[in-house]
């Protein structure tokens, strides 16, 4: 069995939400204040016996409508549904625990627990009276005064909160059957919060956690020996205990012998103070049990070299891992029927807030794999993890990820794995598999950031943040991630973010793509080949033409590219818009003399198009450029720009040039305000994209 969903109403950041869980690991992600901790708190209210059930005024969702508060006293409801797992066979213990909770009684059973925090009915009339007074008074007062909602909340806190009651109902709420606390004892709820002192709880056998684990695994070679029946195991263990008792008595006798003469001196003071009377004298006596010996044991770390250090001197990250391993061992103890009989736990839940604390990336990945293996081995039934770590996220499958996000009236939920469906409801497996391969520790940031800018290549990835500074746009302030998808694969990502899909993450998405015009000789070519903008749609009798015509996917997914007349690639666009900007010519740029001369000629107002063509060295490609320029109907200025842009495009490599150009443009920014600064025209499609993202 597993907790399949949690329905929360009017609790903290949750106005009305249903969160569906997986049978296994649940990786709950989201930005700060998206409701992750509140979700775990809601879970604990039902399943953690140590959790307080009495809530306060600040536990109510403040996004509740004013009219709702006027009509009825606010109520917090948390409803947990438990279902049969996919590979689960219900045990007798499962059914015995769930018997009174069931709402579906067949093999695919379903059970419900509902927590309510409510104002008893007998106080509702008085509540209405107070509400009428607040509303009537509000109509007579100035509009600038405190709004009615705030007045109602203060009134509830002052006059009614003390009357609020909490109940946990089982099965159908209409039946008003309350939870038997003993049945909840069969649930093992283990919670590691984000601010945890693991050293306090595990370093010494004096601590209950380590003591319980040691006691259970004492004589484990006998307890786990399948060749021995239960009776033989008990005989063997009792033999060891008897042997320990003999040795401990010998030890105590030795202590008594050593203290014999000193004891007389110690106890003489009792006689002198009058503590001895009626011939009754103080003395020393005691027995040494195994449990008391555990308190002597200290957790240490032993290296291959034989060096031993106390665990308290160990790093916090490693101590966190040791603590988790002990906690899982304790859960194994708690679930052992032979050890605890009817007190054994039936359902074990491990809840970890920010498991990445103090762990470097590779250890985060290893931890998640360790937890998954423990779940598969059924040492824990269900695991809940909240995280900000992209490394943790990349270590789980999309099916395990639950994404919480803020909206105007609180928190909502998205399920990335459920978004990959076509218009007929069929699963688009190819896109889902592509995204799962794509989401490494860097690129999984798309699930955390508030907005995402997808780009096709390394040049855009390196240069966009520089361009944003030229435009005085702060990507950091808007929590924008720039993600290079290495090609034109935007369609795979549209499933994740298309707000028309109920399971998607509805954040603002912008895609930058190139126009990339192509043509195909009708008589010679089977495939399209790249062409220059000034060659596009020039000779429709000889060529078929095409270009990248991808359009906006939805209202929150917008696509920007170069214009239809001059557009080709980012490099082409930069040179076209900045035809005399020699900052573009970097160390790795080829054909530097030609490019410098072309830019000088452009600055010469008297230069002609032919003069620029004459600078080009003789080659097949340059002849093609000349033919294209002479055949098109562009103005002379457009032709000059096109020659420079074409020659620049053919002289740079994507990655190396982009890195050098980013450094050069950044250096230019440092000169802003002095004579060394040169103006740079940012491509309009990039300006538009950044403007949309930063709104």
Predicted features and spans:
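RecA-like P-loop NTPase motor core
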Residues: 373, 378, 393-510
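Conserved catalytic network of the ASCE P-loop NTPase/AAA+ motor domain
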Residues: 69-73, 105-108, 181-185, 316, ...
């Amino acid at each position: 069995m597993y907790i399949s969903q949690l329905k929360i109403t009017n609790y903290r950041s949750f106005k009305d939400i249903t969160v569906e869980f997986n049978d296994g690991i649940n990786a709950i992600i989201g930005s700060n204040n998206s409701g992750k901790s509140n979700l775990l708190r809601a879970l604990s209210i039902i399943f953690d016996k140590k959790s307080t059930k009495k809530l306060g005024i600040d536990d109510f969702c403040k996004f509740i409508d004013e009219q709702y508060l006027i009509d009825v006293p606010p109520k917090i409801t948390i409803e947990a549904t438990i279902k049969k797992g996919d590979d689960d066979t219900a045990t007798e213990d499962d059914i015995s625990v769930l018997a009174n909770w069931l709402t579906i009684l067949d093999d695919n059973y379903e059970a419900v627990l509902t927590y309510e925090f409510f104002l008893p009915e007998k106080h509702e009339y008085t509540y209405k009276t107070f509400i009428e007074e607040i509303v009537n008074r509000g109509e007579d007062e100035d509009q600038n005064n405190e709004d009615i909602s705030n007045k109602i909340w203060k009134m509830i806190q002052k006059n009614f909160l003390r009357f609020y009651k909490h109940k946990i109902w089982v099965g159908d709420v209409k039946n008003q059957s309350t939870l038997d606390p003993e049945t909840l004892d069969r649930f093992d709820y283990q919670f590691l919060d984000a601010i945890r002192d693991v050293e306090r709880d595990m370093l010494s056998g004096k601590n209950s956690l380590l003591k319980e684990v040691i006691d259970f695994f004492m004589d484990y070679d006998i307890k786990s020996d399948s060749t021995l029946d239960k009776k033989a195991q008990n005989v063997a263990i009792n033999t060891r205990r008897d042997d320990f008792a003999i040795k401990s008595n010998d030890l105590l006798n030795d202590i008594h012998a050593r203290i014999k003469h000193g004891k007389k001196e110690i106890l003489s003071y009792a006689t002198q103070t009058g503590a001895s009377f009626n011939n009754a004298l103080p003395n020393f006596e005691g027995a040494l049990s195994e449990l008391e010996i555990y308190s002597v044991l200290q957790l240490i770390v032993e290296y291959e070299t034989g060096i031993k250090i106390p665990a308290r001197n160990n790093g916090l990250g490693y101590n966190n891992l040791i603590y988790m391993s002990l906690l899982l061992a304790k859960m194994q103890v708690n679930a052992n029927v032979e050890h605890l009989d009817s007190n054994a736990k039936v359902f074990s839940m491990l809840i970890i807030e920010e498991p990445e604390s103090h762990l470097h990336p590779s250890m985060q990945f290893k931890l998640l794999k360790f937890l998954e293996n423990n779940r598969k081995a059924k040492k824990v039934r269900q695991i809940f993890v909240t995280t900000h770590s992209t490394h943790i996220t990349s270590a789980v499958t999309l099916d395990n990820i639950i994404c919480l996000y803020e909206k105007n009236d609180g928190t909502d939920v998205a399920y990335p794995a459920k978004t990959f469906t076509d218009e007929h409801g069929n699963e688009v497996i190819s896109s889902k598999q592509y995204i799962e391969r794509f989401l490494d520790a860097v690129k999984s940031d798309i699930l955390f950031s508030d907005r995402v800018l997808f780009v096709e290549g390394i040049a855009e990835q390196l240069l966009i943040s520089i361009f944003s500074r030229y435009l005085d746009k702060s990507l950091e302030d808007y929590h924008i991630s720039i993600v290079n998808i290495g090609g034109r694969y935007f369609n795979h990502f549209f499933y994740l973010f298309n707000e028309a899909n109920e399971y998607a993450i509805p954040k603002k998405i912008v895609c930058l793509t190139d126009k990339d015009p192509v043509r195909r000789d009708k008589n010679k070519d089977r495939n399209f080949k790249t062409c220059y903008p000034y060659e596009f749609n020039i000779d429709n009798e000889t060529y078929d033409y095409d270009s990248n015509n991808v359009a906006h996917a939805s209202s929150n997914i917008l696509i920007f590219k170069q214009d239809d007349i001059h557009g080709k690639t980012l490099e082409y666009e930069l040179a076209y818009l900045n035809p005399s900007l020699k900052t573009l010519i970097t160390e790795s740029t080829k054909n530097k003399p030609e490019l410098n001369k072309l830019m000088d000629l452009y600055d010469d107002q008297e230069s002609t198009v032919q003069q620029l063509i004459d600078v080009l060295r003789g080659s097949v490609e340059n002849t093609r450029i000349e033919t294209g320029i002479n055949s098109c109907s562009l103005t002379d200025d457009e032709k000059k720009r096109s020659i420079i842009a074409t020659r620049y495009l053919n002289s740079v490599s994507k990655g190396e040039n982009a890195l050098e150009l980013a450094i050069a443009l950044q250096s230019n920014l440092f000169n802003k305000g002095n004579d060394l600064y040169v103006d740079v025209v940012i491509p309009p499609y990039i300006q538009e994209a950044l403007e949309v993202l930063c709104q």
